Structures are given as structure tokens and as C-alpha cells.
Amino acid sequence: MCGLVFMGSKNIGYRDVEVFEEMLFCDTLRGSHSTGVCGIFEDKEHGTRNKLVKAAVPGPEFIASGFLDEAISIRTKNGNVTTIKRPIAAFGHNRYATKGEVNAVNAHPFTHDHITLAHNGTLTGQHRLIDHKKFEVDSENIAYSISKVGFVETLKNLDGAFTLIWHDSNLNTVNTIRNKERPFYLVRTSTNDWFGASEKEMLLWIMGRQKSPITIAEQFECEPGVQYVFDVTNGVFSFKEKVKHELPTFTRFPYSSSYSNFYGDDDYDYWTVS
């Protein structure tokens, strides 16, 4: 079990950063083996660029060590004045390792060419993805596949549980999609700030405990098979569209099962027909 957190806004301020930090901290309950954050910044030459920081430490240590601040700030110094530039969007991942060793290399997110991606879930049929033997971690294989053959072709071969968040620097978009085996919730505020997390109760609790009140305009669980697309062209964050996809189906024969837990998203073992 892993966890994902997300924020995006036309003007990310202190309160947004505080909410994101607290989400990343609490999301450690879903995975304490490693933590990673991708900050997406305006770039005058390319529209956007991202800054990726990850480490094999739990969320609280990631924050205390300054890794989070490194991922979501660009500092420039002019004499005695230091200017801090904030991202227009960011997503974070708290990993509980199911495939691959616990180290910074295997921490999420993963970058391949123009795709930077984080994944909650486990693929039972990684062999369906291109060049699968090259990758110890199935999640990195997903990022690689999207960078090579695109998201639509990759989706056809996603055999297993997933929620994905990824930044496409070619299209200048941030995207999320899930299947029914993994959760993800989004909240839009009255000022059109967006937040997301794997756990609804955690997300709403953190937003509700802020000193400066946050008014929620809408909240919802992402619909399975729907790609939520956020535009970050020219460094301006906005919701763009929802794209409905047909999720692939595979024949599976369960031969053992994990215990059920409160979250209802354990990993299971299957014989999968190729």
C-alpha cells in the first residue's frame, strides 16, 4: 500500500504549501519506506519544468531534512535578498515497497524523457509492458512505457491495481487516473485551488484544521477509467478536461489472498492468463 498527494493552483501560497506538507506527513501511514515529490514550475523557455526530489526516508524525515522545501521552491539570491519561487503544481508519493529494493532510486516519482510519474498499486502482469525485463519496479516501467508509446497504448497493458499521477512536459499537462482497485480523491476550493489524496478523510481533516478557513466548492472520488487533465501551459494551472477511457480486462485466477484491511486496497496474488 502506497499513498499519493497533490496540489495545484494559479497562485500557490503559504497555506497551500502547508496543506501539502501535512498531507505528505500523514500519508506516511500508507507507506514509510521512501518519499518523493515532483514540483512543477513555470519555465519561460519550455512552458513548464519539474523538480524531482526523493529519498529512502519516511515522510516526516523527508520534510525535516529539507527535501520537501527543495522540491517545491526555487531560490534566487540578489545581494542580500532571496526570492522564493513556488510551483504551480506538485505531487508526492509515500512508498510501501511491493516490488524492488528500498532505496532512493526505486522511490517515486520516476522520470523518463518528458514523463514524470508516481503510482499507487501493484501490477500483476508487468510482462505486458514494453521492455519489462529492464525494470525492477513496475511503476518505473509504466513511466517508461508512456514516454515511448503514449498513455493510451500503455493503459491497454496495465494489468493490476493503479492510481497514476504524471506530468507530461511535452503536452504541459498534469494527469491522474485510477482503476477500481485503488482510490484517489480530488477537492476544488472556492478559489480554484486543487488538492488530492489517496484518503478522503485525511484530505478533508487536514484542510479543515487550517487557521485560515478553506471553502470547498466540490469534492469527489475520481471515477475509475476517467483521466483528469490539468493544463499548466505557460505556467498557468487550470483544470482542462475529463477523458473517459475503457479500462482493460484480464482473466485472473486467484490462488491466495491477503487479509482485508480498512482501506480495502491490499495487494493480491494471481495467475494471469497472458
What function would you assign to each model-found segment?
Residues 1-274:
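Conserved short alpha-helical segments that host acidic/polar catalytic motifs at enzyme active sites
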